[in-house]
Amino acid sequence: SENNSSIMKDKKGKERFIIIFLDTIPSQEYEDLQITYKINDKNYIIHAIDGGINFPDDFEKCKNKKKEVVIDLENVFTKIKPRNFEGKHNADESGESIHNSTYFDLSDGTVHIWCTLWGDKMNYADGLTVSLRSKNYTNFLQRENSY
């Protein structure tokens, strides 16, 4: 079947990155997979790989699964102390959406694991996301975007 995509723009409206949403197979742990690369990059260098698991209206179950993933990653990144944050999601102006995030800051990128419980007005699926991001893409998101 056909893959979908989304364009990430900077604050000036310039297209910077493209996100490709991949089809998944039922046996995979992650229900949603996506890759991100720069617009017009002829080498298609991947700047992010994301996997998602849906937890509709179940923030506690999501946080329990997130805790398992974080423990697994702590066993991989033994010298990196993760940063944790919980609060309102910037993408929701109503303030109803919340997220619980853990970050592993690497020398050349970030691993970001988070649960989101979206407010009623937001048309997104609640759930867990695990994202491996290049430093370039991490900086773009911090500078230009609400994620």
Question: PLM features: what roles do these ranges have?
Answer:
Residues Y30-D92:
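Long, charged/polar, surface-exposed segments that mediate recognition or autoinhibition
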Residues S1-E15, D72, I80, D92-E93:
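Non-catalytic effector/regulatory segments
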Residues S5-S6, A48, A91, A125:
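A sequence-composition feature that detects small, non-aromatic residues
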Residues N3, D10-D32, E96-Y147:
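An acidic-aromatic pocket/loop used at catalytic or ligand-binding sites
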